[in-house]
């Protein structure tokens, strides 16, 4: 199965690419981690936030893998411990269905994307830079996989 990270934003600093790549390479083929960067809508002219989010929403829909389990990352989502994430991962992998995590841009996500999600998670109660959210999600997915496989990476 595959874990897709669909992230609005395509010009991340080098530390984001390096951090994400580190954990992506650690994931085994049976739980492949794939990143799709979505170009944010340009904030020019008279476009309001709703119009910007709508344009980004359409871009997200075009790259969303068909039939996947959709998890939106949002600061108002459910907070889960690492152990709970490991349980969720075990359930997702048991279903055989790919999972798509969606990270919004500077203005968040359009309500339509939030409504189509099967689950809504928060990485933190704090607002995080979007690049850091990618790295943190990749690390936590690797950690959850390690827990489920009794790998020594996670030491509780």
Swiss-Prot record:
Homodimer. The gene is rlmH. GO terms for molecular function: rRNA (pseudouridine-N3-)-methyltransferase activity. S-adenosyl-L-methionine binds at residues 73, 104, 123-128. NCBIfam families: PRK00103.1-4, tRNA_RlmH_YbeA. It comes from Nitrosomonas europaea (strain ATCC 19718 / CIP 103999 / KCTC 2705 / NBRC 14298). Its main location: cytoplasm. The keyword Methyltransferase applies. PANTHER family: METHYLTRANSFERASE, RIBOSOMAL RNA LARGE SUBUNIT METHYLTRANSFERASE H. This is Ribosomal RNA large subunit methyltransferase H. CDD domains: RlmH-like. GO terms for cellular component: cytoplasm. It is found in: Cytoplasm.
